[in-house]
Amino acid sequence: MAKSKPHSRVLQMFKRGEKLQGIIFLDNYNGAYPYYGEVHHGAKIYTSENFVDEDFVEQWIDQKFNEIIGGDK
C-alpha cells in the first residue's frame, strides 16, 4: 500500500472534523523551527524555505502524526 503524504492525511482528518495536534513551522532568527501545537479544522501547515529540506519536513510531520494517531498498523 502506498504511503500517503502527511499533508493529505491531515487534510482528510480536518474534513472529518477531527481536532488534532499539528505542526506549524514558524520563522525565527535562525530561519525556522518546529512548533508543536494544537490546530483546528481549516488550519494550515506552514513551512519555511530555510528549514532543512522538504523530505525532512515531511518525515518529521509524518513521525509526529504517527505518534498522535497511533502509527500505521
Please tell me what each predicted stretch does.
Residues 1-5, 66-73:
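Short intrinsically disordered terminal tails
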Residues 24-25, 46, 62, 69-70:
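Residues marking helix boundaries in flexible regions
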Residues 1-36:
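Short N-terminal "domain-start" leader segments
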Residues 11, 58-69:
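Residue-level detector of alpha-helical secondary structure
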Residues 42-56:
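A short, exposed loop/beta-hairpin motif centered on an aromatic-Gly-Thr core
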